[in-house]
Amino acid sequence: MRYCRELMRRPSITPEDAGCQQWLGERLVAMGFDVSHYQDKGVSNLLASFDERPAQLALAGHTDVVPPGDLSRWQTPPFAATLVDGMLIGRGAVDMKSGLAVMLAAVEDHIACYGLPKANWQFIVTSDEEGEAEHGTRTLVERLKAQSRLPKYCVVAEPTADKQAGDVIKIGRRGAISARLTLKGKQGHVAYPKNAVNALHMAARVMQALEALIWDEGSDDFPGTSLQVTHVDSGAFTDNIVPGSCEICFNIRYSYRYSEAGIMARIQACLDGLSLGEDAISLRWERGCQPYHTQENDEQSLIAQVEAAIFEVTASFPRLSTSGGTSDGRFLSSPQTQVIELGLPNRTIHQVNERVELAQIVRLYRIYRALLTRFHD
């Protein structure tokens, strides 16, 4: 609990780190880790491991948090890390400073009980997860790949649980990509429609065509692909003017069965099929995020190991899920690295009065302790 509050009291609003990683690094050095700090365009990153071998197990997380919002709506100051009636309240209580603190405490106590593991362990920490995520985990993974030091297994402390720590784990995430589509018509007077080209009518055709696209329906452990229009703008409203331009924004969440290039090609083919004219459509893609999916190959898979640790502590198995938004798991996952996300109940993430029960922090700590014993050798 002391570690949770130590991190939460540092106002590390993305991409600021506010000294969190310096404090983490000092604790890790005391345990025998070799720690490296990196700064990249205002982002703080940390890599720690026992030696230069590729890690058997990596523990990953982020020190940055989202802004607290309206301070007057908080029950307690958002960076005071206040304890009230068995709850820890403050920004980062769930997402994800308590998760990082649990990882740190679990490793520290494991070493105190069993000594240093024979396997190499690793910490991968960034302050650029809640923001653009361009200069954080992505760059750390690139550094490890260049050194042939990608970990075999990686557990991310993202808040994945529903009601109790360990009841849900993430075994992947859908990919995501946004698009900004501009349609060019011809402005005119509504009384003379033959002299105008209504860009909103063009937009209606486009949206109807996009909605009619058939995607995969998903599976038991992976939601299907979904396209949602998020914004339509035809400029300032005047009821006697035919709009000459219109902007449509949409977002696609897609399964690992698709590639980003495949998604783009399918949307372009759909637009080309409308024959609106080459100069009538301008399409710009934004904020692409790749999907990832970890599969259970055998008894030594990371899923099996995490399930066994959870069962040891809770006497129940977790639900395997890929729901929710994107995470840094997409950067960590590779043919060399299996990734699982395991954390606290996520009901209050990014909310005013973000909070977590102390009992859930203890429960998650016990799960991580059980997991670490499986990677000692």
Curated annotation (Swiss-Prot):
Q: Where are the transmembrane segments?
A: none
The GO terms describing molecular function are: acetylornithine deacetylase activity; cobalt ion binding; succinyl-diaminopimelate desuccinylase activity; zinc ion binding
- Binding-site positions, Zn(2+) 2: 95, 130, 350
Q: Which UniProt keywords apply?
A: Amino-acid biosynthesis, Cobalt, Diaminopimelate biosynthesis, Hydrolase, Lysine biosynthesis, Metal-binding, Zinc
Q: Does the keyword Chaperone apply?
A: no
Q: What does the cofactor section's free text say about binding? A: Binds 2 Zn(2+) or Co(2+) ions per subunit.
Q: Which GO terms describe its biological process?
A: diaminopimelate biosynthetic process; L-arginine biosynthetic process; lysine biosynthetic process via diaminopimelate
- Report any Pfam family annotated for this entry: Peptidase_M20
Record PROSITE patterns: ARGE_DAPE_CPG2_1 (PS00758)
Catalytic reactions of this protein:
N-succinyl-(2S,6S)-2,6-diaminopimelate + H2O = (2S,6S)-2,6-diaminopimelate + succinate
Top-rank taxon: Bacteria
Query: What cofactor does its activity depend on?
Result: Zn(2+); Co(2+)
Known pathway: Amino-acid biosynthesis; L-lysine biosynthesis via DAP pathway; LL-2,6-diaminopimelate from (S)-tetrahydrodipicolinate (succinylase route): step 3/3
| Binding, Zn(2+) 1 | 62, 95, 158
PANTHER family on file: ACETYLORNITHINE DEACETYLASE (PTHR43808), N-ACETYL-L-CITRULLINE DEACETYLASE (PTHR43808:SF31)
Report quaternary structure and partners: Homodimer.
**Name of the protein:** Succinyl-diaminopimelate desuccinylase 2
Gene source species: Shewanella loihica (strain ATCC BAA-1088 / PV-4)
